[in-house]
Design a protein with these regions (language model features):
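N-terminal catalytic or cofactor-binding beta/alpha core of small enzyme domains
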Residues: 1-112
Length: 112
């Protein structure tokens, strides 16, 4: 994943707060083959928070704050979870199995 942009930053000022948009994108690195999901499924709310990136940008601008946007799908790995949580890499989302997340080894999880 070294050639994959994992984050985007925005610097709109020095307000004493920080905007973090953890589910800003539904992107999956090519090497993960869309986790075995059709593109239209990745484009739904299970792959990301639709509109969250635009909202984060607008908030950052209005509040004159710095912002950080995650540029990968929460289905790849959820940046809003602790490393020890079982749902860090979800097996399913809204009862839809995620084929690329089934039967992962400890090494697979560590790679992400």
């Amino acid at each position: 994943m070294t050639d994959f942009p994992v984050a985007e930053t925005l610097d709109c000022g020095n307000a004493p707060l920080f905007v973090f948009v953890d589910h800003a994108s539904n992107a999956v690195p090519e090497s993960f083959d869309d986790l075995g999901l059709p593109k239209d499924v990745l484009g739904t709310h299970i792959g990301w928070d639709i509109g969250a990136a635009a909202l984060g940008r607008n908030l950052s601008k209005r509040l004159k704050a710095k912002a950080l946007f995650c540029r990968f799908s929460r289905l790849l790995i959820d940046p809003n979870r602790s490393l020890d949580k079982p749902d860090l890499i979800p097996f399913e989302a809204d009862r839809i199995p995620i084929p690329g997340n089934q039967d992962l080894t400890a090494a697979d999880r560590h790679q992400r």
